[in-house]
Structure formats: structure tokens, C-alpha cells
């Protein structure tokens, strides 16, 4: 009997640990140098779109290459110096989830290589999700567990990268 209680306790601890790892959206992103998706060529995040504009004006707007910031090894473009300053004050709040990698692709695989379309996006619970097409972006509103699956896959991917 003691053995099965121990097993049960270990299961509870494992599930609790997984919940803390995934975080249910409450955790900060685990981003490191080199995690930002800059496409196959160049070093520009979000194909040059202003990550702050998604939050402040609710639109995908192309940033000005003359108004930029460097963060985590990527160059970020902005439509105004005000947006750049907001980003630099708290980049994790404005950076897209999963380093800008395709969010719905991340929900299905830990090694996403899908191109993104910065015009295919959603802000859900204060977090920016970028997808590869409008239909996929809209799925984040309609398929409840996509974000949880993507968060779990991102955690696995980050753990895998850290152990390499």
C-alpha cells in the first residue's frame, strides 16, 4: 500500500512539475540568443513588421529599417521611436511567442521550420502569436488546446536546445 501511495505522490509531483513548466500562460517566455525566427536569409525579426503595433494599434504594420533595435541576436524594426522605446523597456511583453516561429506549427511539432506571414496573427491574453496563414491564425481562437500544446512543444524544444 505504501508503494502505491508513493507512486501516486510521484505522479502528482510529475504533473505539477509539467504544469509549472508549461505555466498556463502565466510564465515569461524562455527566449535566448538565437531563438528569434529571422527567416532563412537576413537577421530581421518578423520580416520587418513592428511587433509593438500589433498591441498598440491592432494592425500588422511594416516597420522602418531606420528605426530599429537589436535584441537576442535579431534586428527589430518599428514604425516609430515610441514603439521602439516601448519594446526596449520590456521586450518579452511585445515579442511574439515562440520567438516568432509559426505558432500553430509549434502546436504540432517541436522542430518547426514553417515560414511565417506577419499579417497572420492573433493577440490572445496579451500575447502575440504569428502563423503562416490567416486560417491557421484563426484556429488559435477556435481550438482551445493549441496554445497549451504549442507551449508544451516550445518547452521541449528549449530543453532539447539547452542540452545540446
Task: Annotate the PLM regions.
Residues 2-13:
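Bacterial N-terminal signal peptides that target proteins for export
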Residues 27-164:
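Charged, low-complexity intrinsically disordered segments
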Residues 12-23:
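Bacterial N-terminal signal peptides
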